[in-house]
């Protein structure tokens, strides 16, 4: 009997969900087992959350379970994404609920993978005890006898590198936790859970009216087993920064679904700017979201420059208000810390080997300066290629080797194009920058569901990007097993992990995915399409709203809409003493 394609897709989809479930179960097992080579000790009173056993996992078992979770999660994502391309589907709401329940369960058990959460607790403790987190180190606070600071392992001699909003959240958690590092970490975990869940619900709302896109968003973010491990179970602040980035896109380009949206008015631009500024006050990398929003406006409003200027001014004013307040609070000490961090080159980055070669010719900090310049140039090149190559970004152009129009362009129009520009800048930075850690990819994963996929026929550009991002995140996850150094000595039988994976395999895979991204975007060959009543609707440049068919535009013809189609889918080398991950 010949098997119908839908049957094969259903089998792959079911297998993918089983693999994802197994990955989450293994992640939970490592966390609930208690302190191990993967999980630092959380000092605190007995019975305080987060709760765990004291199973004393051997280093071999802890690493094996974590590696198994990464492998199962990666396989599960591959299967479900491919199954969706074959027409497989399940209720998106069920996946959202399952993902949120998994995230909640992982919040109730201790974080693992790195010891960054202990540094967060110490920075909050500094704030509530009257110390400046940007000039005070956990070691200095520990010398005063503070029990929370004494619990810090990695980054023991490093002041905070996070924005004032992140520090304020850490301070509030410290007020609740008091002298208990354990309870403080738990409160921070609740904040991270809220940010993760808010992104999940935002994406689901933004994709309303399209079950396929809602399912894709749920699988790529809410039920993504790699993010559940690296961001939620890892308790990293990157989820908070990602929330403000997604919220800015949602506000700027709304309403999503329902009636056809117009180009945003200045209040939306100002509100989006404020959200970007708040994200900047968590992690400075969120400034890329604001830059992407500005570029998106410039691309689509070139024929109406009189409208463009006030919108850009509103966006900039909103950002300046929030980011300016953050800089005023953080002061020059925060800027110095950010400057020092920008000089770091992760061992897992291919730039580490490049810098070593440059060191043979130059001395001092010149090699690092050359690497930073090269990374900046690469990021610009990647951003340009991505903006030119993603579907629906440039008005009147398609992008897909299969020759079709990108789906969701007609269904989402300007919002999809704007989100694609923001995604392009974030992805370019991630693939180009010398300082890389697995959880940094969270912002790209959060924005990816907003980018329309290419048609089912042929290999879509966005689908190819999805595979490259998955390969990159998985490689970093394996490379940082564990992302700890202090109090996490590996036994002789596991001593090969860092020199083989982190120093060797991970940089090679990251370099390979970057090269493949360049090739993919160069081969996308953007081509201009002519507008016809059947496949496009002209935009009136005076109002920047869709024209009714047959109506003569009052100004130059702007962006055109295409027919809808299927919407499927460190350790730092420069880290101060005891630094392993950030």
Where do the language-model regions lie?
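Specific aromatic-rich, kink-prone transmembrane helix
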Residues: 198-202, 241-260, 385, 426
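Transmembrane-helix signature of polytopic, membrane-embedded enzymes
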Residues: 90-94, 203-224, 399-405
């Amino acid at each position: 009997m010949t098997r119908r394609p839908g049957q094969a897709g259903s089998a792959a989809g079911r297998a993918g969900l089983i693999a994802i479930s197994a990955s989450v179960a293994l992640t939970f097992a490592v966390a609930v087992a208690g302190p191990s080579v993967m999980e630092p000790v959380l000092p605190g009173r007995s019975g305080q959350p987060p709760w765990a056993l004291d199973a004393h996992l051997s280093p071999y078992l802890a690493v094996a379970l974590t590696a198994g979770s990464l492998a199962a999660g990666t396989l599960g994502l591959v299967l479900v994404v491919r199954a969706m391309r074959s027409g497989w589907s399940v209720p998106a709401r069920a996946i959202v609920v399952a993902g949120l329940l998994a995230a909640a369960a992982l919040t109730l058990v201790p974080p693992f993978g790195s010891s960054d959460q202990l540094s967060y607790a110490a920075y909050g403790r500094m704030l509530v005890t009257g110390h400046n987190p940007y000039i005070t180190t956990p070691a200095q606070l520990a010398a005063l006898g503070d029990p929370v600071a004494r619990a810090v392992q990695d980054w023991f001699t490093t002041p905070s590198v996070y924005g004032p909003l992140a520090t304020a959240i850490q301070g509030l958690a410290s007020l609740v936790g008091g002298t208990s590092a354990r309870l403080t970490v738990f409160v921070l975990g609740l904040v991270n859970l809220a940010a993760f869940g808010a992104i999940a619900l935002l994406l689901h709302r933004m994709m309303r009216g399209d079950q396929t896109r809602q399912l894709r968003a749920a699988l790529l973010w809410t039920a993504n087993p790699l993010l559940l491990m690296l961001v939620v179970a890892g308790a990293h602040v990157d989820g908070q920064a990602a929330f403000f980035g997604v919220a800015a896109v949602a506000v700027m380009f709304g309403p999503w679904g329902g009636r056809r949206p117009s180009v945003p008015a200045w209040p939306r631009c100002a509100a989006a700017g404020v959200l970007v500024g708040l994200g900047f006050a968590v992690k400075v990398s969120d400034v890329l979201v604001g830059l992407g929003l500005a570029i998106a406006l410039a691309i689509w409003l070139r024929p109406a420059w009189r409208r463009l200027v006030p919108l850009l001014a509103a966006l900039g004013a909103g950002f300046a208000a929030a980011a300016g307040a953050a800089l005023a609070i953080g002061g020059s000490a925060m800027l110095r810390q950010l400057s020092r961090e920008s000089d770091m080159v992760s061992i897992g980055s291919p730039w580490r080997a490049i810098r070593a070669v440059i060191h043979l010719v130059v001395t001092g900090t010149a090699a690092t300066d050359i690497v930073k310049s090269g990374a900046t140039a690469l990021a610009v090149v990647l951003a340009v290629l991505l903006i030119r190559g993603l579907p629906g970004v440039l008005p009147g152009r398609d992008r897909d080797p299969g020759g079709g129009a990108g789906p969701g362009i007609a269904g989402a129009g300007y919002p999809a194009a704007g989100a694609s520009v923001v995604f392009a800048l974030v992805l370019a930075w991630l693939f180009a920058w010398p300082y890389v850690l697995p959880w940094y990819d969270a912002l790209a994963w959060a924005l990816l569901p907003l980018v329309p996929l290419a048609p089912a026929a042929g290999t879509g550009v966005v689908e190819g990007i999805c595979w490259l991002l998955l390969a990159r995140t998985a490689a970093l996850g394996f490379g940082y097993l564990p992302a700890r150094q202090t109090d996490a000595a590996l036994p002789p039988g596991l001593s090969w992990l860092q020199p083989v994976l982190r120093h060797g395999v991970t940089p090679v895979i990251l370099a390979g995915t970057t090269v493949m991204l360049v090739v993919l975007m160069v081969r996308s060959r953007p081509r201009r399409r002519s507008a016809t009543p059947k496949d496009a609707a002209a935009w009136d440049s005076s109002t920047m709203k869709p024209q009714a068919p047959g109506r003569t535009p009052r100004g130059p013809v702007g962006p055109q809409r295409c027919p809808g189609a299927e919407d499927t889918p460190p350790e730092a080398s420069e880290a101060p003493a005891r630094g392993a991950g950030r």
